[in-house]
Amino acid sequence: MAPLPTNPLGSINQFQGAAKDLADELDYLKGKTARATAGAGLAVSIPNDVLSVAFMAKGYAHGRVSSSIDQQDIDYLRRIQRSNVVAAGVALDAALNGTDQITKNLNSTASGRAAIVSDYGVAVARQFDLGGVPVSVGVTPKLQKTWVYNYTTSIYDYDSNKWNDSRYRTDDTGFNVDAGIAADFGEHWTVGVSGQNLMSRDIDTKDIRIRNGRTGEVVSYKDTYQIRPLVTAGAAWHNDLVTLTADGDLTETKGFKSEDTSQYVGVGAEVTPLSWLAVRAGYRADVKGNDSNVFTGGVGFAPFSTVHVDLMGLYGEDETWGAGAQLSMTF
């Protein structure tokens, strides 16, 4: 943020210039929100003709930084900017009573909220033959650890290094389960349904209270992180060279209660011109219209069919971008 002058009795023009810069920044931040997601995972599989078992650990994070800009803050700063009399009066008041006489009249807030979820579980899967149709069923019971952060403060005091302080953090541990089923029809078609986090969980953030400098009213800032079942259905057509996929969420994607929900559909294609090389492209859209639609692309390498390296990137509207990598080894 633009700094307020430490010596309010200095140049009135400088004081008004600082007020203008700060008002301009508040105008720019009004309604702005930034979101980010990240994930990582590790799995060790033990294939078996009767029952396949895999030990898994994965984590994913969801974060959002947003501002709540009070229009009265902007109006107050514009009055300082445009009137020498107002600027001189505010500067004199600050000189006599301290510079907090200025900032106490500014009540815009900034909020950084984040959730980090880690899963530790054992996945078991088995294939059956139902009327000549190969059907695979898998279940993953898992321990789920969640950390939820709610760093909300005056926008003029916001410090991104403080968001993970323990006084803004809530910890929670629970149990959850994933499950899925897939069937192969003929040589080229596979259809399936998967369910993640089949047990709903709610984790409340810390209740952060901020006093309004103008009215004296104490405002409570609290949220709830929602873990909800996510059920997705998909189909794939494949041969030795090409795989085409389509999938869609049958349930909404939840996050913080204060956020809009999303529900995604996507299509993708993979071409394997060489036994050790795969090239991928796809598109994902939010049918709710609350998240950016994105294009994805990637490449996979499998030298000697032992080491598998997958790289991907995505790009979409509203300055949405991302990247990912996966490494696996077969022994």
Regions inferred by a protein language model and the residue ranges of each:
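A subset of solvent-exposed loop/turn segments in beta-rich extracellular surface proteins, enriched
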Residues: 1-165
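Short sequence motifs at beta-strands and strand-loop junctions characteristic
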Residues: 24-37, 110-117, 167-174, 223-229, ...
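Loop-centered beta-sheet repeat module
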Residues: 139-206
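Outer membrane beta-barrel transmembrane domains
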Residues: 188-331
